[in-house]
Amino acid sequence: MKALFLDLHAAADFLGPGAVEINRYQTEIFDIVRRRGVFGQRVKQVPATGHPSRFFEQTAINSPTAANAFVDPRNIVPVVGSPTRVERSVPLKALVSEINYNLFDIEVGAQQSQFAFLQAKDLTDSVEGLLRTHDVALWNGNDTSLSTPTTAQYFGAIGQIEAGGNTVTLGTSDSIVDGIKSVVAQMVASSSYEVRPTAIYANPVLLDLIDREMKTEFNVVLSTVQITGGLTVKALSTQAGDLPLIPEWALGYTGTPGSGSAVLPCYVVSEDLIEYHWLTDPNPRVFQLGLTGSLAHQMVVVKFGGVVVKGASYAHYEVKVTR
C-alpha cells in the first residue's frame, strides 16, 4: 500500500484569502442518448405457444371456380374442395446484458450523496439499452429463416418481407409518392387476400424527400395524423386511406441522397399482422446474482422472444427509393 500527500491546489479551482473554490456539479446528468425505436413500441405483443411458437396460416378457402360451381339444377353434381392451411413457426431468441456495481464505488457514492440516483439510472439504462438492440434487430436481425434458424439473432422484418418477394425499386426519375401509392393500390386490389396496410415506416431522411416532392411538384403540404397520445406525424393519402408516415431511425440507408446512387427503403406494413412472441414476460427481466469474490453486484438483464411478419408475401411491401 502506498500513501500519497497531495497539494490542495491540485483540487481547488482557486485558493486565496477568504476563498477556496472547488469543483461542483449539477445534480442532473445531461442525457439525450437515443434509446427506443418506434417500431418496437408499436409491434403487437403476444405470448409464445412454446419453442418454437406455432400458428396456422390459411392461404385459401374452399371456393370452386365458376365452371365447377354452376351446374344443371336438374343434375346437381358438386365438386369436392377443401381449405388450404399451412403450419408456421417462430423460433424464440435470447437477448442478455449485464452491468456490475463495485461495492467500494457504491459506498463512496452513497456517502457523497450527490449522484445517489446513478445506480438506479444505470440499471434502467441497461434495460433500455437491451431494448434498443431489440428494436434495431426487429428490423435488421440477420437470421434468414423462421423454420431453420441460422444465427442467434431475430429473422428481422426486413428480411422476412424481402423473402416474401414484395420488393419494388424506384429509379432516380420516378416519383416517390406515386410509387408508394401504386404499391398500396396493388396490395388493396388483391383478389386473394383482404390486405389493409396501416402504416409506412421510413428513415426521416426519406420522409423529408417525400415532403419536399409534394411541395415542389404539387404545392401540397401533407396532412397530419395522431398515431398515439401526443405524437403526430405526416400522412399520405392512398387507396387504403391516410397512412401515417412514421419516422424510424433504425431503418438505415446507403449512399448520399442526391448522388444518384443512394438507396433509401421504406416499408408499407399491416401492423396488426406483425407479432412479437414473448416468453414469460414481454418486458426484459432483471436478475441480481450473488456477490462475486470482488464483492461486485452483478445485474443481468434477459429477454426471450421472436418476431414474425404474418403474410409477408402479400400484406407488406418494401419500396426502395434511389436518389
Map each language-model feature to its residues.
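Flexible, glycine/threonine- and acidic-rich loop/arm segments that mediate assembly and lattice contacts
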Residues: 1-239, 244-263, 269-323
